[in-house]
Amino acid sequence: MTAIDVPWLSTPRRDNSHGTRSNSSCQPSCTQRIAVPISPDAVKYPLAVFCFAWAVTLGAYLDSQELVIGFAFHGWDGDTSIPSAGTCRIRIRPEQEILPALDEVVADGDKGLRSWVAQGAGSETDIAIQRKEVGDSLHPAVHGDEKLSPEIIITPSGNQGPYHVQGRFDPHIVAPALAHMMLHQFAFAVQGIVRGQSSIASSQVKDLQAISPDGMAQLMRWNRQSAAEEDGACVQDLIQRTCQQQPHAMAVCAWDGSWSYQELDCQASHLASQLCDHGIEPEKFVGLLFEKSKWTTVAILAVLKAGGAFVLLDPTQPAAYLSAICTMTRTALLLCSSHNQRLAAELRQTTIQVPRDPYHGAMPTSDFRRQSSPAVQPHHTLYACFTSGSTGRPKGFIIDHVAFNSGLQTYAHATGLGCDSRVFQFASYSFAPSITDQLASLIVGASICVPAEEELQNDVEGSISQLQATWLKLTPSVARTLDPGRLPCVKTLILVGEEAQVSDVAAWQDHGITVLGLYGQSENAKGTMVSRKSSEDADPGNIGSPFCAVGWVVDPDDYHRLMPIGATGELLLESPCLCRGYIDNEDETKLAFVSKPSWLTQVRGQGTAQPLLRTGDIVRYNCVDGTFCLVGRKGNRVKLRGQRLELAQVEHHLRSCLSSTHPVLADVVQPANENGRDPMLVAFVPWADSQSAADATDGFFAPPTKDFQTQARAVLGRLRHLLPSFMVPSTLLAVRTIPRTGTGKIHRRRLQEAASMLSRKQLMAYISPFIPYRAPETELERKLQRACGRLLNIEADQISMQDNFFDLGGNSLTARQLVAVARAEGLQVSVAQIFQQPTLAGLAQTHRHPVRRAEVPRSSHDPDPFGRVRDDVRREGLPHIARGNIEDALPVLYTQMTTARDHCVDFFPLRVIGGQLDPEQLRLAWTRVIQAFPILRTVFPRFRGRFIQLVVRDIGDSNFYRVVEAPSGQTAEEWARALCTEAIQFRCPVDRPVAQLTLIQAAGSSALVLRLCHAQYDGSCLEHLVRSLMMAYHGRPLVVESDFQAYTRTCLRLRIPEVLDFWRRFLAGSSPTQLASSMTGDREAARKINRSFFRREVNSLAAPAGFTLATVVKAAWSWVLRNETRSEDVVFGQLVSCRGSVPLPHADTIIGPCMNIIPVRVGRDLLGAVQAQHAQTMEFDMIGMDEIVRHCTSWPAGTEPDSIIIHENFHVDWEVHDGGVTIQKIAAVFNQQPSSLTFLITIPTETGLIAVLMAPANMSSTHADRVLDLFCNTLTRLAWSPAAVLRRSE
């Protein structure tokens, strides 16, 4: 209990049956005295007046309207008609007039004061009225030999007064400063009652609970220190000043490159001129749709230079949510990165991609001036930001330049932000702190450190260290995942969003790091209060003092009434940093922004017109120093993991998804026995069916049924496309009846309390079916079980390997923590894998520990069992290749064989942005890359009738690098596409070097074309290849941890009995499913005719609970094959990536085709079989299809799967930034050879996937369309209602 808490009135209780005190070790030891300047003769009914005044005072501090007061009344002229001691129960009605209220106290039934008997209810405090000083103790009839805290002793000083009031309190429970303030408030109440007795004018009881004159005087002293003035500058002007003062200082240091202040200014000026051409001017919004990137800062500054206002759009949020934001702000233009082009298209806005085409000619000047529209004024809009709203729409507000700049220097000083700070840009773009971190840093001359999104998910600590960030702004939950000892670069930590514990602060302070707390509202730019945290803080809830605002504590239900100092109330904020109000929401604005409270007019005068913000936060003053302590939130506003949300907005979308006219509620619930863990957002849905009625009990909740689980999962899936993830409930509960209060209102608290009696597993059972317990079977599984138990505060043996990590209480934050803990145990997992395989069993299958692969035998006396191939080739020789030029020779892998056989040579045009590349420097860089990666020097000749991969030492100078001038009138990119389209028509021999880089130059632009055989690459390695090229171009060393030769040797060594036996068992009695058998036309003839392409886009798609999207794709295709071929047992092929399977260091950076085609076999159980097979085959997925057919089946030699699934779960579009130059992948040109096989390619998107069917020539277009439609429809049904599809398939 802290010294500011006041549940002290209920500590000692009178035992009703014996009339004596309970034992209490709490002894009053702090005495406070004041004088009440009224005459005793003026007080009628002194006992009633003083008891009523004390009850009114306590009611204000306790927020209570009914109190029991113990009293002693003695030594008063020997009047024995009044009881000497007893208790009285007093009800406080704030709207009641004072005199009638006092009359009720006096009258209290027919007997008046004489009904207050000593045998009454236990009192909550004691008050004594005595004629003269009789010592420090109360009348013995009140408490015998024991003491009670607090005690009030009132003694008159003669007939003329004043009264002397003495209060005695336990200082461990009531701080002396608070006790002093309470006595002044008591004196104020007494005077008000006395005036009410003699005055004709009516006053209300609530007027007695308003702040006392002494309290107001103290407030004015404190608030003079917080007074703030407006700053009339514009943000872009302040940033421009920084750019001029320190042009060569680092402005942005990001994962994708960096900008000096001069470079930033130039880039932003160039983009600003384009924005002006699109009509951007003051009060027009530009939406910024970027992932974490250095280009976000450029876009922000460009919009400001053009005179416009910006709104940051977080690409992780649903398109519908972002579209609503664009509509509300009337967005005139959208700037987006190439990675977010598809999402931008869904928002249907005019869009400019950033970075765009390279500059024409020299770097643009930074001397940008607006000529075509009025100059930007400080009152113009700076940005809009959005939070959770109560109407079902996002709640947006506008911050202007004045609001942001006012108090900025005070903010910087208070938070330790200066020109030497390196600010870690952690906050999501959907939250206001991300904007402050950008703009404030640029104004003071700091460096903005921008991590990659992947690093924020998987390795925050490593990212901070790599960027050498010195200034962090994190929630305490995130800070707990970091080890300050491994971050010597950090100097300042700002904790936001949640209450920090003493242990949070101590962990960082022990390493000499300054820890501060920042409290504020998004509607108040930059934040409101800063507190210096200490491991010795008595009250972790202390949020400090305002740095550019004045805070007032008012009655939560009546902002015209200031609360006494030390009492809790709603924080009302007066500040020049406030926003203008809520966009297109006048009702919400009127509720939140209030003008001219009556008390403020008395303080400021009639000229006060600035609105004040009702924050919704319940706070109280620290009576010692005027700082604020945060107590909680008001009404239906809640905070979950540091993020504010309106329950009404969640409920609006729930009703919409459920099409319900019944009340649907949402609330934050703390599951049973989970103190210290994150609570859950839970939805309560009315539900009644026959099973619920049959199982009816006295409880609120119906038992979970399959039908409810299916509907609940579907609703959550729809919500994920409408709301940000933190606003989507973790579960839905089936409620038989909604409880109501006596007045008919919904009784939220009873529902919340009932749900809090359930465990997390019981809560999650409403969306997930019951799964029997499975104990861990391997050491890997036991490690994961222990790690989850430690992170989630659950006994390890209570966790089943079939449990869903997120159903156990995991979230995106604990997923990051699990990655860190797992890596400490030597387990390589990522956040993405946790989301894809949320069960512990699935996660254990995803991880490939090197020890397991080490079991693959390798002859000790023959370090390279394939060396004989190289020796034989050197001895026998090959045409066109000198023996001395042969560096290595190996058998080809299965996918290499198929692509070399079909002469698959592909072309990749690459856009160059940011400057011209030097041709000679690029040639030398490409030479270094070819020497570093042997696969680029590999050719694929036939040797003894079979393809081999042969690595040559020197590929020659004739064709590996070219420089081409684009014809006049064509850009480099246009000519690159033309060259690729022409070159693809010619067959390129693969028994000679294929890898080639072409530099295309045009006036003011350049482009690259990369030519590779598909036997040399896969889609995952192209970005790393181009990144290595740019590293070599800028003179940095190339580090190759593993190459494709090592990968090939590892795969070829897997021809061992264990692996072959697995595939024999797996494929026993099967045969490849021939989709072509249902087609018309000659299969052999189809091998010579080009294939046709058919494309569909599937939106609003999410995998069912416990399954991945890849599993659903394969299950849907297997259902299509069953439907087309009438076969119960189907076998098809799947292209898999083996980078996660091979036990080689940094396998993700290998340049080469680390992929394979393996068979997929599915019986009647679609989803379950596919998911199980995925886990089983990962141990054996590096053996080629030809080896499987030859050694593990009775199929004819050369059998291939008739249809092959390719699920591209990697980034198809990418760009590489290095040294001010950006290389951007654009549409590739593939050499599509004729084939009789059917390929289904699925590419995940933000909201679903794109499906492409590559049909052989003997499949008619009508048939192909029907097959693809059937696949897409099945895919959608499986995602939304797998049970329905499975029932239909039986």
Swiss-Prot record:
Region of interest called Adenylation, as start-end residue ranges on this chain: 260-657
UniProt-listed SUPFAM superfamilies: Acetyl-CoA synthetase-like (SSF56801), ACP-like (SSF47336), CoA-dependent acyltransferases (SSF52777)
Residue span(s) of domain Carrier: 775-851
GO cellular component terms, A-Z: cytoplasm
Keywords: Ligase, Phosphopantetheine, Phosphoprotein, Repeat, Virulence
Region (Disordered) residue spans: 1-27, 846-870
Transmembrane segments: none
Entries under Gene3D superfamilies matching the protein: 3.30.300.30, ACP-like, Chloramphenicol acetyltransferase-like domain, N-terminal domain of ligase-like, Nonribosomal peptide synthetase, condensation domain
Region of interest (Condensation), residue spans: 914-1162
Comment block on domains: NRP synthetases are composed of discrete domains (adenylation (A), thiolation (T) or peptidyl carrier protein (PCP) and condensation (C) domains) which when grouped together are referred to as a single module. Each module is responsible for the recognition (via the A domain) and incorporation of a single amino acid into the growing peptide product. Thus, an NRP synthetase is generally composed of one or more modules and can terminate in a thioesterase domain (TE) that releases the newly synthesized peptide from the enzyme.
Name of the protein described by the UniProt record: Nonribosomal peptide synthetase 6
Gene: NRPS6
